[in-house]
A protein has these predicted regions:
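A short Gly-Trp-Pro
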Residues: 1-21, 28-163
Length: 163
């Protein structure tokens, strides 16, 4: 069992009770989280735009210890975008090696999950805690967004506020 499996095959939530479930497009990879996200944000950086083929990335941030995989550990693919290498060197991107769906960004302590992968019912009822609190790297935006959320040129509170 490698380091990733040791970390995510178990979780440090006392009496782990799944609160939310996420899965890739094909369903081969599934994971649970036992808490609400600590934050959620929209990233407009060029790297996120290119990796997701979209103008932005919406991420809900969890402590890694609150994440537990229930299927598909053997179908995970890792990519370190800073080094441009398909390896699990943190921080890295995590995707399904079958359908190619992006699952999360894995940091050293945090798991940045993509809320659109979670099962919020049909029609979806996204919990308030998953809704974004700000935009980061808004200076690289493809188009303006008038949503009244704070907008930062780079990272939150350590770059210029743009709106």
């Amino acid at each position: 069992m490698d380091e990733f499996e040791k970390l995510f095959a178990r979780a440090d939530c006392t009496n782990f009770t799944a609160k939310y479930e996420a899965s890739c497009h094909c369903g081969a990879v599934r994971y649970h989280v036992c808490s609400d996200p600590v934050d959620a944000k929209i990233c407009h950086c060029i790297m996120c735009q290119k990796l997701h083929g979209a103008p932005m990335q919406w991420a809900a941030i969890f402590h890694k210890r609150h994440v537990r995989f229930c299927a598909g550990l053997n179908h995970l693919r890792f990519f370190n975008s800073n080094l441009n290498r398909a390896e699990r060197i943190l921080p890295c991107k995590v995707s399904c090696n079958l359908c190619g769906a992006h699952l999360a960004d894995e940091g050293r302590n945090m798991w940045l999950a993509f809320p659109s992968l979670f099962d919020f019912g049909a029609p979806p009822k996204v919990p308030e805690t998953f809704k974004p609190t700000c935009h980061i790297f808004y200076a690289a935006r493809v188009f303006d967004m008038d949503d009244r959320l704070p907008k930062w040129a780079g990272h939150r509170e350590i770059s210029a506020r743009l709106g």
